[in-house]
């Protein structure tokens, strides 16, 4: 049974997903179907947690929209994800950044920036 699960996950795995860690600011283009039309909707926010592994991996992205905090749990292997770009790499000392929920204003999205070495 375990081999069957691994086989199914290997065939359905998304390979072009960038490395994302809590604290990173990401922009995700999601396919939204409204009636017969299909359009792309951008969701940009801070990754406050990642959970699971393999085909069950999800990330929780939080943004502030018109003064209201909005969180979205996004499955990494979802066919509705068109593209994912990392806008900024954040430096977090925790695996889960749930303390950002209690903050208001600019402090709600403030995470130190991680300096990345350029890869050649």
From Swiss-Prot:
A GO BP entry: translation
Keyword annotations of the record: Ribonucleoprotein, Ribosomal protein
Keyword Ribosomal protein tagged: yes
Pfam family for this entry, one: Ribosomal_L19
GO-annotated cellular components: cytosolic large ribosomal subunit
Gene Ontology molecular function: structural constituent of ribosome
Biological role: This protein is located at the 30S-50S ribosomal subunit interface and may play a role in the structure and function of the aminoacyl-tRNA binding site.
Similarity comment text for this entry: Belongs to the bacterial ribosomal protein bL19 family.
Protein name per the record: Large ribosomal subunit protein bL19
Source organism per UniProt: Pelodictyon phaeoclathratiforme (strain DSM 5477 / BU-1)
């Amino acid at each position: 049974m375990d081999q069957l699960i691994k086989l199914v996950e290997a065939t359905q795995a998304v390979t072009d997903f960038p490395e994302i860690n809590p604290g990173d600011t990401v922009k995700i283009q999601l396919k939204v179907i409204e009636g017969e039309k299909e359009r792309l909707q951008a969701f940009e926010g801070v990754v406050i947690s990642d959970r699971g592994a393999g085909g069950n991996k999800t990330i929780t992205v939080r943004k502030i929209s018109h003064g209201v905090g909005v969180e979205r749990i996004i499955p990494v292997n979802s066919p509705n994800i068109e593209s994912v770009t990392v806008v900024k790499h954040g430096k977090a000392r925790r695996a889960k950044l749930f303390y950002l929920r209690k903050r208001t204003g600019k402090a709600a999205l403030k995470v130190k920036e991680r300096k990345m070495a350029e890869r050649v």
